[in-house]
Design a protein with these regions (language model features):
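Alpha-helical transmembrane segments of multi-pass small-molecule/ion transporters
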Residues: 1-384
């Protein structure tokens, strides 16, 4: 067994360990505590070490724009995924519009990037993610209110307070603060050697805990509900296939040939969906607390289930692709994988929801029979 395959096997064992711990620690406080540690301590420490350990190139400043462009492209292609998956419920469609184009690489990708691609790739990923954060925090916030106003026929836009809260969240989030601090530190011509060794050792020790804690958290996040599973799994395959297809096409068109960058963008394109759109939907849901459930703008329960399945799906998918890293460096192979994901998503949609396709087929046959009867009657009238 190769060293990469061996390490990935260990990762899967940690996920399994987390899943088994789920039955021991079934209180939400345990899971929430792990999440707080990851997002507020382990990830910021790891990102800081990765950024100050590399030389930041001025071209890195374009990375957030690349992420923003990718988010917007997936957002406008989301109706295609919804059409393929036969989602007809308006509340679910709005919920998926919010989620499908969002990405959360911090939990699903950063530990893997840190382990397999190194400091420089993690530094790039952190800067790229800032563009994604602009999209999920600001753009999707306005989308949520647009859906709310349209659904409730509401023209009053008293959004100043929540907008201020969102902007504060953007700049006060620990990961973003660390990115700004690290970039300011490097822009002052300082290096990692200018940081006290005690602080470096502390951050390094915290960094070493990131991967196992995240993988255990992913194991804890795995849920099994047959009906929910059948509705969400096809969409996760469709989303991954579309994101992989677009990122690969963009890299080929722009002439990317750096192996580490190719692997980095492939991994990032397979990130799980972000929690931030769910917070926007929850905020809107609170505004609609006096409205009947079926008339609300979003289906927050469905959104929460989608989040719960997205994180383990993304991480397991990425880990499954890494044993043969050379596979990811051939664009034809990646195209094949992305198209396979799309076909699997379509196949699962048909298998899990056959009645939708049968009803469509029935409607189609009814239409054909109507046309046939119309022309038959017309012909008989003419002959008479």
């Amino acid at each position: 067994m190769s060293s990469v395959a061996s390490e990935i096997t260990v990762f899967f064992i940690l996920i399994l360990l987390g899943f088994l711990l789920k039955f021991k620690f079934n209180k939400p406080d345990f899971k929430n505590g792990l999440k707080l540690y990851i997002l507020n301590i382990a990830l910021p420490a790891t990102i800081f070490i990765s950024i100050v350990s590399v030389q930041i190139n001025s071209k890195y400043l374009l990375f957030p724009l690349i992420a923003l462009f990718f988010n917007i492209m997936i957002f406008f292609l989301s109706p295609v995924l919804l059409k393929i998956s036969n989602i007809t419920d308006a509340r679910k469609k709005r919920t998926l519009f919010m989620l499908l184009a969002s990405f959360a690489p911090g939990l699903s990708c950063f530990p893997i990037i840190n382990e397999f691609l190194g400091y420089e790739s993690l530094a790039k990923a952190s800067i790229i993610d800032f563009g994604n954060k602009l999209f999920v925090l600001i753009f999707l916030f306005f989308v949520a209110f647009k859906f709310h106003n349209s659904n409730q026929n509401n023209t009053n836009n008293n959004n100043n307070k929540p907008i201020n809260t969102i902007i504060k969240s953007l700049f006060l989030e620990p990961i973003n603060i660390i990115i700004f601090m690290a970039i300011l530190f490097l822009s002052s011509r300082s290096t990692i050697n200018d940081i006290p060794i005690l602080l470096i050792d502390l951050f390094s020790k915290i960094k070493d805990t990131l991967t196992p804690v995240v993988l255990i958290f992913i194991g804890l996040s795995i849920v099994f509900n047959r009906n929910v599973f059948k509705n969400i799994l096809p969409l996760l395959f469709l989303r991954s296939g579309l994101c992989l297809l677009i990122s690969t096409a963009c890299m080929q068109i722009t002439g990317f040939n750096l192996s580490e960058d190719i692997k980095l963008f492939i991994v990032l394109s397979l990130s799980s969906v972000s929690f931030w759109p769910f917070l926007h939907m929850t905020f809107v849901d609170n505004l609609e607390k006096n409205i009947e459930e079926e008339k609300k703008t979003f289906d927050t329960r469905y959104g929460l289930n989608f989040l719960a399945y997205s994180l383990p799906f993304s991480t397991i998918t990425i880990l499954s692709l890494f044993p043969n890293e050379q596979l990811l460096l051939n664009f034809n192979n990646v195209y094949f994988i992305s198209i396979s994901f799309l076909l699997i998503g379509i196949f699962l949609t048909i298998i899990f929801n056959p009645y939708r396709f049968k009803s469509k087929e029935k409607k189609s046959m009814d239409g054909i029979n109507y046309i046939r009867e119309f022309f038959t009657n017309k012909l008989e009238t003419t002959q008479k």
